[in-house]
Amino acid sequence: MSMVVQQEQEVVFDAAVLSGQTEIPSQFIWPAEESPGSVAVEELEVALIDVGAGAERSSVVRQVGEACERHGFFLVVNHGIEAALLEEAHRCMDAFFTLPLGEKQRAQRRAGESCGYASSFTGRFASKLPWKETLSFRYSSAGDEEGEEGVGEYLVRKLGAEHGRRLGEVYSRYCHEMSRLSLELMEVLGESLGIVGDRRHYFRRFFQRNDSIMRLNYYPACQRPLDTLGTGPHCDPTSLTILHQDHVGGLEVWAEGRWRAIRPRPGALVVNVGDTFMALSNARYRSCLHRAVVNSTAPRRSLAFFLCPEMDTVVRPPEELVDDHHPRVYPDFTWRALLDFTQRHYRADMRTLQAFSDWLNHHRHLQPTIYS
């Protein structure tokens, strides 16, 4: 088993070998101005919000609104996700990422697609590669009723019954629960933006039929952690992210002009706003730049659920959020168009939504019948 295989200028990331190497391939070394360096990172003060049945609704709405106005990140507890399911989801993640590289590559992600196994971003980019492996798959809330391939069927098809069946059972339940929680949070977000009364269910209904993404992240230990990143600085292009971290820290958020850490808290889920919801809120709430760092002693794992609308649903803010003082900031678009942009044309960063809007306006000008 070799550390790096060079085939047509493409690097293969083998975590089982690379994690013990004192030198790392140059493709994983980030520029000094972007790498973590040796500066100590302080912890970010993040709201810890009880969203349980007994929580006072007005307090939850207020805390969520304040968090989104500050930096877009908050923690939720008493969220209704059973601890046993979270633990089993992490066990299944361990089972997958400890498979031999060849077994994991049975689910290899194809160019231009958002689902499958990815060992770093090899094949997509040639520099500033992230120090991680991922397994991503689609979750459709309407999958069962429309006969679409579900999470379980996808994982069995890609990994075979031996490895895929148990993962499929666990992550089908996990995604269902994440979708449920996402819809509850969407209703809270709407209320915090002033969408109340008969319209308070607006965002819940918008995402009721969602076409979301589930991602398992594995960040191996690295003997040069100050020179690389587990995930580079970016804003999520999706609508809402719900993250469960293991006990190893690594998530950092750009807030108050510097990088700040969000430490893991047992039982808590990390929630943040993405670019698509930023557009839906007419930029009242903004997606926040964040990254993941690695360390030299312990691997880090996380489970990320990315709430997304159905592919061809038009993303535009509700009428309550557009007025003379708040004119439209972004053009109408579909999630399919934004997803395709990030997979084929643009590497997600802090400017993704603006770059996409500029690209969309340019192409609509050139070919209005196609992009209108």
UniProtKB/Swiss-Prot annotation:
Key oxidase enzyme in the biosynthesis of gibberellin. The keyword NAD does not apply. InterPro entries: DIOX_N, IPNS-like_FE2OG_OXY, IPNS-like_sf, Iron_ascorbate_oxido_reductase, Oxoglu/Fe-dep_dioxygenase_dom. Residues 209-309 form the Fe2OG dioxygenase domain. Fe cation binds at H234, D236, H290. It comes from Oryza sativa subsp. japonica (Rice). It comes from the Eukaryota. Its EC number is 1.14.11.-. This is Gibberellin 20 oxidase 1. The lineage of its organism: Eukaryota, Viridiplantae, Streptophyta, Embryophyta, Tracheophyta. The gene is GA20OX1. Induction: Negatively controlled by the level of physiologically active gibberellin. Plants over-expressing GA20OX1 have high levels of bioactive gibberellins, and exhibit an overgrowth phenotype with increased internode elongation and leaf sheath length. Plant silencing GA20OX1 exhibit a semi-dwarf phenotype. The keyword Ligase does not apply.
